[in-house]
Amino acid sequence: GTNFAIWAAAATRVELCFFDDVNGKLVETKHELTHRNGPVFHGYFPGIKPGQRYGYRIDGEWNPARGWRFNPNKLLIDPNTHLLYGDLKYVPEIYSHQASDGVGTGNITIKDERDNAQYVPHSVVTANVKSDQVRLRTPWSKTIIYEAHVRGLTAFNLDIPEEERGTY
């Protein structure tokens, strides 16, 4: 089985959604995470194994002026996932607000009710493997820290449209 947990302090409801391909069709199964410890919603699912695709749908107040854009119609990836399945498709349905194109042009105060699951990557359950990475112990005397500024890096880059070069 697999434990799932997500921090969502201002959320009122969190659904964990599993995705499977059945006869060439994407099938979604939703499970409300009813266990909550403070800001963390969580649950254990005994039959879930590595390879299972999933995502979260999180509900709460829609108040763009406060930065709250909860929209249960939008599938979110797990911020702690180690693996993603699928590509992001730039279509209006991926935005939480009503967008008219793939770059999000539209009215950001109106919630979009369309589902986005077929257009966004899904998180994938991976095996619980201990990391064999070893922390580098480079002494400060041999450490180099590079500092870069967007303006300086882009001012003369010919791959960037001229009107955007050197801007933030």
Per-region residue spans from a language model:
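Residue-level recognition of well-ordered secondary-structure positions
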Residues: W7, G55-R57, H149
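Short, intrinsically disordered, charge-balanced linker/junction segments flanking boundaries
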Residues: R165-Y168
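Short, solvent-exposed loop/turn segments at secondary-structure junctions
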Residues: A9-A11, E61-N63, V150-A155
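The feature marks proteins involved in alpha-glucan
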Residues: E28, R36-V40, G47-I145, F156-D159, ...
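Insoluble glucan recognition modules
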Residues: G1-T29, L33-T34, F45, I144-Y146
